[in-house]
Amino acid sequence: MGYSYSEKKRIRKDFGKRPQVLNVPYLLTIQLDSFDKFIQKDPEGQQGLEAAFRSVFPIVSNNGYTELQYVDYRLEEPEFDVRECQIRGSTYAAGLRVKLRLVSYDKESSSRAVKDIKENEVYMGEIPLMTDNGTFVINGTERVIVSQLHRSPGVFFDSDKGKTHSSGKVLYNARIIPYRGSWLDFEFDPKDNLFARIDRRRKLPATIILRALGYTTEEILNLFFDKITFEIAGDKLLMTLVPERLRGETASFDIEANGKVYVERGRRITARHIKALEKDNISQVVVPSEYILGKVASKDYVDLESGEIICPANGEISLETLAKLAQAGYTTIETLFTNDLDYGPYISETLRVDPTYDKISALYEIYRMMRPGEPPTPESSEALFNNLFFSAERYDLSTVGRMKFNRSLAFPEGEGAGILSNEDIIAVMRKLIDIRNGRGEVDDIDHLGNRRIRSVGEMAENQFRIGLVRVERAVKERLSLGDLDAITPQDLINPKPISAAVKEFFGSSQLSQFMDQNNPLSEVTHKRRISALGPGGLTRERAGFEVRDVHNTHYGRLCPIETPEGPNIGLINSLSAFARTNDYGFLETPYRKVVDGQVTEEIEYLSVIDEANYIIAQANSNLDENNRFTDAFVTARGERGESGLYKPEDIHYMDVSTQQVVSVAAALIPFLEHDDANRALMGANMQRQAVPTLRADKPLVGTGMEKPIALDSGVAVVAKRGGTVQYVDASRIVIKVNEDETIAGEAGIDIYNLIKYTRSNQNTCINQIPCVNLGDPINRGEVLADGPSTDLGELALGQNIRVAFMPWNGYNFEDSMLVSERVVQQDRFTTIHIQELSCVARDTKLGAEEITADIPNVGESALSKLDESGIVYVGAEVKGGDILVGKVTPKGETQLTPEEKLLRAIFGEKASDVKDSSLRVPNGTSGTVIDVQVFTRDGVEKDKRALEIEEMQLREAKKDLTEELEILEAGLFARVRNLLISSGADAAQLDKVDRTKWLEQTIADEEKQNQLEQLAEQYEELRKEFEHKLEVKRKKIIKGDDLAPGVLKVVKVYLAVKRQIQPGDKMAGRHGNKGVISKINPVEDMPYDENGQPVEIVLNPLGVPSRMNIGQILETHLGLAAKGIGDQINAMLKQKQEVEKLRSYIQKAYDLLGNGSQKVDLSTFTDEEVLRLAGNLRKGLPVATPVFDGADEAEIKELLKLGGLPTSGQITLYDGRTGEKFERPVTVGYMYMLKLNHLVDDKMHARSTGSYSLVTQQPLGGKAQFGGQRFGEMEVWALEAYGAAYTLQEMLTVKSDDVNGRTKMYKNIVSGNQHMEPGTPESFNVIMKEIRSLGLNIELDEE
């Protein structure tokens, strides 16, 4: 495989045995594709906004003479770009303009003649736009809309598993779930009657629904039952025989025909008997007349003369009715065929409990159930019933629902409408009865074929439709008011309801979440999260164990490992690495096709529904060089996802990758296959909490997943086109694009501006650092600059640390860690946190608040860091309590004493009618001010600081644009120069003249002259565009800000805090091995090896066996080997050995065992490239051990050997304090450690004086409230056990809720009297009040 220039800088040795057939797909597809469908980037097909408009329009007036038609829509360009929206705190959105047509028809004309057409464009609010990274900027913060896993529309058959009724009888039910509209349920009760419910309301006999559809009793019976025909022949009764129906019954009479007895009375009829009857073609048998008694008539039998009903349909036949039927001249009687085994009489029984008798009474019954208390009329009942299931406006199964419905009921695919038909309802009842009869089985609700993904686009479309429907009602009213001559579409539409619905969804829906921006991985995982919670989903409390559990259909679709611990476990899942959604919203996963035992390169995506019929081999099945299975039997998944052994020729598909099963976060854990799943879950979750360190350090032991995550997360800058680096500094990179990638007529220069020191949602620091040099050749898609937690385009969440597993004086008890001081000195885990503090000046009733440096009663020193506008300088170092922005608020006039009045009169002091409400640094925080932004309302005069900031922004904008122009001009003039020189001009002459004069030259060659003219035009264009961009920027900067009502000014101050690692900080490895730092130990006290190299962290060996995460030990060994090879390379470089020796050693390392899929050939590298590679391998050879396909023991030992290290992975250590040898070798190696965002600085606080709870008068709790520490029940026991009575009394009274006692104590302390008088705690009063509220009087007698 060929490596590009930047890939040659550092190559990861890959232990994967299996070639990668399919690269990891773009990780944010699920978000971006869904939103593109919503705003319909691809104009084909009706979806998203288009579908919403089409479903609501045209809106027709009630009289039908006017209608408002939809023509098309367009999205405007957003006013501000993403970055500006974040700074200003506004929403990144585009205005929606819709072209509507108002058509009115002539009322007088008989044919619909058009009288008038008005068409214009209407503004319909704003639609938030998705950024390139799949997020939304709402009110200045980045948010993610999490996809939802909900029950797919369609029909589901289920049972209560015997839990409802005390007898344990299993009751079956069917539920038709539409995409929108009313649910229709059918269910059996314990007496086996079939009932229906609409929208989970009161149940009705199911036959009422059938009657409402217009079926009579006879038709209903015909739909659900087979018939038995009896013939009356004189005094004999003959029954038409269908032998198959007799199976399992006991004969109540001799079954005989043609003088031969086939079954004797009292015998059970078996298959042998049935065969004999079929063989002799017996079609009728004589039955005794008692046999027909109790059978049910299938239709009405009427006396033709009198018109009287002898036996109604569904009526039982008795001797009397039999005689009457014979008398009336009936020779055949049809009855229903039922038995106890597999043809139950359920519908017949239900008809008996059904109080209705015809269509209208059934409609009335449904109306009373849906709208209790309203008197039904025939019209309203009919309309209500039709609107429930048969109106396309109110009911929609959707294409997914119809597809699931047809598959479930074995209807032809693709037939049927979005509404229900009579046949649909009957088919559902039939299937439910079949299931009750023991044919067919219920669905599994947790099967991923019955749950589908609703992504951003679809949810936004639904919200948009809700808004449109609200608008539709208003428009209908307006259209029916008349006077339409003066009205235009613009007057009819009020965009408020639409923008309100959209805003509410993006701003406050349960699925619109504040993006987790701790590090690139947490961003990617958040966007790939699938939640079963949210509107229309489950709730935590109601979700049982089954829903949360791993299901076999999750294979390759949802990760079985990554899910939160706690109440949401199993409800929030993560998409597997290769999974995607199909058009219906079901999850699919890729497989390689297998033909006759040969695995092809062809890849197919299968959904769970399609997968059911195939046998699928695992990705680690052994193949020979022709891609044939080598084993006689292959482990594969067959029917129902159960695994078993199959012959190679029976296999249809094979997994594409071993990482297919897990999500990206779990795929980052090396040796995942050796970790217990519970710990792997913690590992996957904790990687998302890692704070980006000051200097990112790639993991020595990775999995190969680091690169795709870093690239797809969008934190690194990736080249859009290939070229050469022309300019690079800390804030911008300029690439001269390759000739073959430029578009004709453009300058061929790409400029990338980098993000510097900005704040993320979690207060971590986002900063991009260039990783290319001048003149480097660049390919498209390569990394130009590293973002937070990326190192040469690879995800780097933590640091490679030398660890030893051994006890050390109890400092690693219970998962604590002992850390060497060297780690702190080298700033290995130092992180930068940026806090945003804002100060808002409002207009109050008493007057406007003012931002000023003139603050009453504040000393000079407190104002030393403020400028004359009262705002802190950039670069000032501040600590808790310092003023950042001086602000005064007017306070109401107070009554002054005569003395004060006199003083006022003499000194004219007016300052005391304002109070200080300045923004101060919160307690316990300190840092450096790195940025200040001032936002001023339109029409309010800007202060000096705001003008300075404005001027600076204008200067920077102009400088940026000028530099951009210069770069582009240079590119353009270089082309002009080449053109002129190729036409014979003298280079030296050209360089003497002003460049702009070059464009005025004339060339004899016409084609070249045209090119020159084109370039001259481009130059003009560039100039114009520069002026235009500058003007736009200027307007944006000068323009007043759009602030909330009543707000005059907002000042935002950004503080950067540098945090070193310290005791109490939480750290973790990638295997769920987390712990807290107990002590920072001097380097000289740490255990060291024979070369005098100390370890950096000491971990507790007891944390490994019981937790069963052995992956960490293998990682440590492999890390040691990788570092050993790095050390060898480093030694060679230091000794300045010849390049060939270096090349062969590095080649040996790459060629060592287990390089199945990756071949690195260093002979194609130049000496310079080998040296650059060696320089990057000094700190260790990075290795990749893919999940389930990683390095094994033998390979690790070989690598250790090559690094000149003991193959046991254990080293003799010496105690740093005494220099004595420890009694046995210790496992030492390199582990990748992360610092998690649970820092002791954010958690520790101590209360001095603070607020009290209103009712109990006890101090509040928690850091946010500046609360105290609860002295709880168990702590009281401790003091009681010591007999410390006075201490205990103090704790329970004056230090807690004895209000008088604590004020007295304060007075005593102030007056120097160390005395305390405890009183009655407030809790006693509270409990007395509570007892009184129960109606019990309680009084305290003072005796």
Curated annotation (Swiss-Prot):
GO terms for biological process: DNA-templated transcription. Keywords: DNA-directed RNA polymerase, Nucleotidyltransferase, Transcription, Transferase. GO terms for molecular function: DNA binding; DNA-directed RNA polymerase activity; ribonucleoside binding. The keyword Iron-sulfur does not apply. GO terms for cellular component: DNA-directed RNA polymerase complex. It catalyses: RNA(n) + a ribonucleoside 5'-triphosphate = RNA(n+1) + diphosphate. DNA-dependent RNA polymerase catalyzes the transcription of DNA into RNA using the four ribonucleoside triphosphates as substrates. This is DNA-directed RNA polymerase subunit beta. It comes from Haemophilus influenzae (strain PittGG). The lineage of its organism: Bacteria, Pseudomonadati, Pseudomonadota, Gammaproteobacteria, Pasteurellales. The gene is rpoB.
